[in-house]
Structure formats: C-alpha cells, structure tokens
C-alpha cells in the first residue's frame, strides 16, 4: 500500500511549490490533482453528476459572473463529485518512497470521510490580501476570464469565491482536527516546506 501525503487548502497558498520541493528532496512521486480535474469533470458529467454536468455546459461569462457565495458552494459540491477519481488514480501509482499530492480538491471533510489520518493530511490557505496580490501576477488569469464582458468584475467574483473557500477549509480543519497553515506572505517558502516536512514526519 502506497504511503500518500496530502496537502489541501485553497489556491495561491504555496501548496504546489511546497509539494514540488518535498518530492525532489525525499524522492516522492508528485501528483498534482489540478492537472487531472478536467478529465475527472468529464467522467462525472457523463455519469450524470449535476454540478459537473452543469459546469461543462456553462460559458466563462456564466461561470464567473455568478455570486461568489454560489460559486463557493458549488465548488465544494464539484470536489465531492470528482473526489473518487482522484483517490482511484492515487491507488494506481507505483512509488517506492511514497506519494505527495496537493490540490484544493482535498477538502478536509472529504479526507475525513475517506479515513485519511491527521498525520497524512494538512491544509495551506492564504490570507485574502496575499491571495489577491499574487493571483493578479499569474499569467493564466486572462485566459481563464476570456469571454467575460466585465473581466474585472469576473476576477472580483473569482477572488471572492476563493476567499470564502479558504475560510471554510480552515473551519473544517478545526472541526476535524487537521493541521492548517495560513500563509500571509511573511512565511518564506523554506519555512513553509520545513513545517510541512515536520508535520509529515520526513527526516533528512
């Protein structure tokens, strides 16, 4: 049985960078769940999962002009619908030293339901200010919002969704007693990696 280490949280918190560094340092297989979400969404839509089917049929305008509260609620429902596919893929990965995987898909409630112990899961979320300032620098943002008539409002809604998502993740971590780090930008990547390594029990 593979040893799998999960990093959940919300976007723009440092999850990917942390996982990449740890995968190289400890020779772990790195599984970035975001790279597979489109495929999972297609599978779930074909199975009639309502949120995945709905999103598949929506335009960028329809997706990003929704109220942030609704976007956040449906984001959690989306991850519920695709979660099984991520777990199935992880079971198929061979790796002698273990697997480190990260993504917002690893929602605390879903991890608890799947029986993932607190020693194998943690979440990293950003503060609102850190999230928005860094998201504005990301090159893919214009492509995601392509097709939206009011791109600034669409971006505002997107950020609102992720702020709400991060708050709910932190709430669930407290509820299920999972380790959680809040990144406000003052935490250097070395410190973030170090705290994650200590939590997972990695040894130099």
Model-identified regions with their sequence ranges:
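ATP-dependent small-molecule kinase phosphotransfer cores
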Residues: 39-98, 105
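Short glycine-/polar-rich loops that comprise or flank the Walker A/P-loop
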Residues: 115-120, 176-177
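Hydrophobic anchor at the beta1->P-loop junction of P-loop NTPases
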Residues: 7
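NTP-dependent small-molecule kinase module
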Residues: 164-204
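ATP-binding Walker
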Residues: 12-13
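Short beta-strand-centered segment that lines the nucleotide-binding/catalytic pocket of NTP-utilizing
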Residues: 28-44
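A glycine- and Lys/Arg-enriched "phosphate-lid" helix/loop adjacent to the NTP-binding pocket
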Residues: 118-165
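Walker A/P-loop
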Residues: 16
């Amino acid at each position: 049985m593979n040893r799998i280490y999960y990093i959940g949280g919300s976007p723009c918190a440092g999850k990917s960078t942390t996982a990449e560094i740890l995968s190289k340092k400890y020779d772990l297989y790195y599984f970035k769940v975001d790279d597979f979400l489109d495929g999972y969404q297609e599978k779930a839509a074909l199975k009639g999962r309502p949120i995945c089917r709905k999103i598949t049929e929506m335009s960028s305008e329809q997706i990003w002009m929704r109220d942030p509260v609704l976007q956040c609620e449906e984001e959690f429902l989306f991850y519920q619908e695709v979660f099984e596919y991520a777990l199935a893929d992880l079971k198929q990965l061979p790796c002698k030293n273990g697997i480190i995987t990260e993504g917002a898909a690893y929602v605390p409630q879903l991890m608890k339901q799947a029986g993932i112990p607190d020693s194998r899961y943690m979440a990293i979320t950003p503060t609102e200010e850190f999230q928005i300032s860094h998201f504005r620098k990301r090159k893919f943002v214009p492509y995601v919002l392509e097709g939206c008539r009011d791109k600034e409002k669409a971006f505002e809604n997107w950020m609102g969704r992720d702020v709400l998502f991060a708050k709910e993740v932190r709430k669930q971590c407290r509820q299920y007693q999972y380790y959680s780090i809040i990144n406000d930008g003052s935490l250097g990547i070395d410190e973030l990696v170090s705290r994650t390594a200590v939590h997972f029990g990695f040894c130099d």
